[in-house]
Amino acid sequence: MAQLFFRYGAMSSGKSIEILKVAHNYEAQGRKIALMTSNVDDRSGVGTVASRIGLHRKAVPISEDLDLFNYVSELNKSDVESGNGRVACVLIDEAQFLKRHHVLECAKIVDELKIPVMAFGLKNDFQNHLFEGSENLLIFADKVEEMKTICHYCGHKATMNLRINSGKPVYEGEQVQIGGDESYYPVCRFHYFHPNKQR
């Protein structure tokens, strides 16, 4: 039975490497996947899923106006007609940047096309507000799973993302600022509020 999955975690929790692993596993069994990512994240180029350990792969960029249901329906139809087989799974990286309509389209892919959708992304931003995509995935997903990582400062479980500028914490600004290890640290709640204190 197809389901909508949301796997979330703080920065550096292995979300992108996990999605690349899932894609590989499906394809190793001869099954077709649709690999997609938000066009907002351009750190490695628009339409690229890239992990911090260096693995990367091209993906379909999701723009604000892309209808995911129609895209997957057409992809599925053309693949079946050409003999390439049906799409077995839709994989979406950087899902926090999805709009509400994208998440509803993902649910429609699951419910009407019977294709599982696995979305990976951050849950909360650097101010601990939910991203639009994450909020709607938490509402509409059949299964939600946390991907764990450790606090940059103490090694406890990290649940938050601390924005950094020149080594100093930043608590105000635009919600979206694309960056990696140089801009964000995964942190526990204590070190989110007290980054310079020992726990």
Swiss-Prot record:
Q: Does the keyword Kinase apply?
A: yes
**Which UniProt keywords are present, listed alphabetically?**
ATP-binding, Cytoplasm, DNA synthesis, Kinase, Metal-binding, Nucleotide-binding, Transferase, Zinc
Q: Where is the active site?
A: 94 (proton acceptor)
Protein EC = 2.7.1.21
Record-annotated disulphide pairs: none
Catalytic reactions of this protein: thymidine + ATP = dTMP + ADP + H(+)
Task: Kindly state a single biological-process term from the GO annotations of this entry.
Answer: DNA biosynthetic process
Claim: Chloroplast is one of the keywords in the record: no
Q: Where found, per UniProt?
A: Cytoplasm
For this UniProt entry, what is the primary localization, expressed as one broad class? cytoplasm
Which EC class heads this enzyme's classification?
transferase
Question: By its UniProt entry, which InterPro entries does this protein fall under?
Answer: P-loop_NTPase, Thymidine_kinase, Thymidine_kinase_CS
Q: Which amino acid positions bind ATP, per UniProt? A: 9-16, 93-96
For this record, the Gene Ontology CC terms, alphabetical, are: cytosol
For Zn(2+), which residues are the binding ones?
151, 154, 188, 191
Q: Name one GO molecular function term.
A: ATP binding
Quaternary structure (record):
Homotetramer.
Report the protein name in the record.
Thymidine kinase
Q: Which organism is it from?
A: Lactobacillus johnsonii (strain CNCM I-12250 / La1 / NCC 533)
